[in-house]
Regions:
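Extracellular loop and loop/strand-boundary signature of outer-membrane beta-barrel proteins
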Residues: 8-14, 52-57, 93-100, 145-151
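Membrane-embedded beta-strands of outer-membrane beta-barrel proteins
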Residues: 25-27, 39, 68, 108-110, ...
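Residues that define the transmembrane beta-barrel architecture of outer-membrane proteins
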Residues: 19-23, 60-66, 104-108, 155-159
Length: 167
């Protein structure tokens, strides 16, 4: 393995990964007394946050996130909700590596709350993220002189359950 590949992981090595500037704009609206909706926009200025070997400079743009959600109190004891998120990274072939890659995505989430009384409730939720495949083709795969392709892909599914006490 070439030394430059392992250098970031050497004992005592410091790897910069600055927190980017962040802009968030959100609006919520109560459509009815028991029905609420919200939209949000997030921008992460990843392109100007310091990363190892100035990796941020290979991004095409910062990260854009678009979100929307709705919440409905069906009855006093039951609330359901749903939401959507679209994340768009400014990816490039030079940014993606085998040890650190990103994929643009969209997410769907659904949830419910059951209120037992004024103090106790239970929440249940499911969240699914579908990541876009990112295909990276190189003329010299891992410096072998042979053309090669990597497909970066993943998926994420989360189930949540909580028992809540309000005091």
């Amino acid at each position: 393995v070439p030394e430059e590949v392992l250098k970031p992981y050497a004992d005592g090595e410091q790897t910069p990964s600055d927190i980017p500037a962040f802009l968030s704009v959100a609006a919520g609206y109560e459509i009815l007394h028991n029905l609420r909706a919200s939209v949000e926009y997030h921008f992460f200025d990843d392109k100007h946050a310091g990363m190892l070997n100035d990796r941020q400079k290979t991004l095409k743009h910062g990260t854009h996130e678009y979100l929307a959600g709705i919440e409905w109190d069906i009855i006093k004891e039951l609330t359901i909700s749903g939401g959507f998120q679209k994340t768009n990274y400014g990816l490039s072939n030079d940014f993606q590596t085998d040890t650190s890659f990103y994929c643009s995505s969209y997410s769907l989430g659904f949830g419910a709350r059951v209120n037992f009384n004024e103090s106790w409730s239970i929440d249940v939720a499911y969240f699914w993220t579908n990541y876009d495949d990112y295909t990276k083709t190189t003329e010299s795969y891992n410096n072998t002189g042979v053309k090669g392709t990597d497909v970066y892909s993943r998926t994420n599914k989360v189930f949540g359950l909580s028992l809540n006490y309000h005091f």
